[in-house]
Design a protein with these regions (language model features):
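ATP-dependent carboxylate-amine ligase catalytic core
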Residues: 2-113, 121-148, 157-161
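Phosphate-binding active sites in nucleotide-utilizing proteins
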Residues: 247-323
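Acyltransferase
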Residues: 185, 198-246, 252-260, 417-450
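Cysteine-nucleophile active-site neighborhood
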Residues: 301-376
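Internal gly/pro-rich beta-alpha loop/helix module
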Residues: 127-242
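Structural motif
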Residues: 8, 87-89, 118, 150, ...
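Beta-strand->loop->alpha-helix junctions that form or flank phosphate-binding loops
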Residues: 40-41, 174-182, 275-283
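C-terminal and late-domain segments of enzyme folds
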Residues: 110, 244-246, 259-268, 275, ...
């Protein structure tokens, strides 16, 4: 596969409005007749939901640490398939990456994809100083090409003129200047923005307003011309699991409480031969009939904990199926759903831990090694993932060893029928875990049929 027109939307730091600008740009490009694809640098689940609403296409992630740098071009090409321009939103500041340097930073992905960068600057509290800021970012790394600037939160026409004049000596063109407008801001909470699935009508209304603003304030033809500047990039195909057999069905949790499942995870499950059957733990009274496995990703069960706890039919049915050995992969919010309780509300009770929300953030990439035999493989099986949560579970399990630069601990449950952990896994660079899970699902189906 080849990757054609592409551009990276980066920020000088977190909070400058990257997601607002990137999402508005995608919506404006689509309105102008383009077919934009999108991707998000890093493991984030929430921002890609905004991209998907704007583009009308499935969201994607690009993470060199989780997936390996070699997999990133292929994942980007998949995100760009059927589009005429790929818009990649960065993470944090342009050069901020994993704890071991700039790995998995926005700059890292821009280098890997040979993609030009548009730098988003919060210009609300500066004038001439913007030139020093942009010059520093544009010259820091010669392999990262800052091809333009979008000024955000500009106060007035006079303010915009001052900013544009200040930037002339840098040689970095101003591609747009967006006015300060609180009506175009997204709602947020403890893990970032509120997911689109929780308030789609509100987001759609704000997105329409944002698309109007970007269309009026950003030079869209110049953005597309910049994206078309690099030559096409040849991309190896992404590794996917081989089919394990026909007629395999896997239930995947969704809805407002469980929206953290990667598009690439769904693709990997389908490649392995699974039909995806969605279910909503808030609304459904039972698992879909006849499924061969269950995936319960993360989300915000803590926000909906009373409603989840009140849905005893679903929780009891889930517990009954798990006790018969139905292969289940539960991550973070899914782990909490299987616990005894969350903030005093009874959950499925499959696991002995009691969950509670805290004020301490657990965040970072993890090397994971199994300490017990499981559907993943024998003791010592490894995978990569990340954590991002404010909750705690006590007891929290001891079947997995998690290592990072800052230390190690044990957590989670890993058995022949269950993986329950705080760690989120992305299959883009390693299809093995999904292949192992679907093999366990097929074995369970065959055993049930005998």
């Amino acid at each position: 596969m080849n990757l054609g027109a592409r551009v990276v939307i980066a920020g000088t730091h977190s909070g400058v409005g990257k997601t607002t600008v990137a999402t508005g740009l995608v919506a404006a490009l689509r309105r102008a007749g383009h077919r934009p694809g999108t991707a998000k640098v890093g493991p984030d689940f929430i921002d890609p939901g905004y991209h998907a609403l704007a583009s009308g296409r499935p969201p994607r992630n690009l993470d060199p640490w989780l997936c390996g740098a070699a997999a990133v071009p292929g994942l980007a090409a998949r995100a760009a398939d059927g589009t005429d321009v790929l818009v990649v939103e960065g993470v944090m500041g342009l050069f901020d990456g994993a704890s071991d340097g700039t790995v998995s930073s926005t700059a890292d992905v821009a280098r890997i994809l040979d993609a030009p960068v548009i730098l988003v600057v919060d210009a609300g509290a500066m004038s001439a100083s913007v030139a020093a800021l942009v010059h520093g970012y544009a010259t820091w790394d010669p392999e990262v090409r800052v091809g333009g600037v979008i000024l955000n939160r500009v106060g007035s026409d006079t303010h915009e003129t001052m900013l544009r004049e200040a930037l002339v000596p840098t040689g970095v063109p101003v591609l747009g200047a967006l006015r300060r407008d609180d009506a175009m801001s997204w709602r947020d909470r403890h893990l970032g923005l509120v997911p689109v699935v929780e308030h789609p009508d509100v987001v759609k209304a704000a997105l329409d307003r944002l698309a109007d603003a970007v269309t009026a304030a950003v030079d869209l033809p110049a953005v597309v011309a910049l994206a078309r500047r690099p030559p096409d990039l040849s991309c190896p195909a992404v590794s996917l699991p081989s089919p394990v057999g026909p007629d395999l069905t896997v239930a995947v949790a969704g809805g407002p409480a469980f929206s953290f499942t990667y598009t690439d995870t769904l693709d990997a499950l389908r490649a392995a031969g699974a039909e995806i059957v969605p279910f909503d733990p808030l609304a459904d009274s039972a698992l879909p009939a006849g499924v061969d496995g269950v995936v319960i990703g993360g989300g915000f069960p803590e926000v909906h904990v009373e409603a989840l706890g009140a849905n005893r039919p679903l929780l009891d049915d889930l517990a009954r199926h798990l006790r018969t050995g139905l292969p289940t992969w539960a991550e973070c919010g899914g782990l909490l759903l299987l616990s005894t309780e969350l903030d005093g509300n009874a959950m499925a009770g499959v696991l002995p831990g009691r969950g509670r929300m805290t004020t301490s953030l657990t965040l970072g990439y993890r090397h994971v090694t199994t300490r017990t035999p499981s559907f993943l493989g024998p003791v010592g099986t490894t995978l990569r993932g990340h954590e991002f949560h404010y909750s705690a579970l006590d007891p929290g399990g001891t079947d997995l060893d998690l290592r990072s630069r800052w230390g190690a601990r044990s957590e989670g449950w890993a058995t022949p029928g269950l993986l329950a952990t705080y760690v989120h896994h992305h299959p883009g660079g390693d299809p093995g875990p999904v292949a192992a899970f679907t093999a366990a699902c097929a074995a369970h189906r065959n055993h049930r049929a005998t």
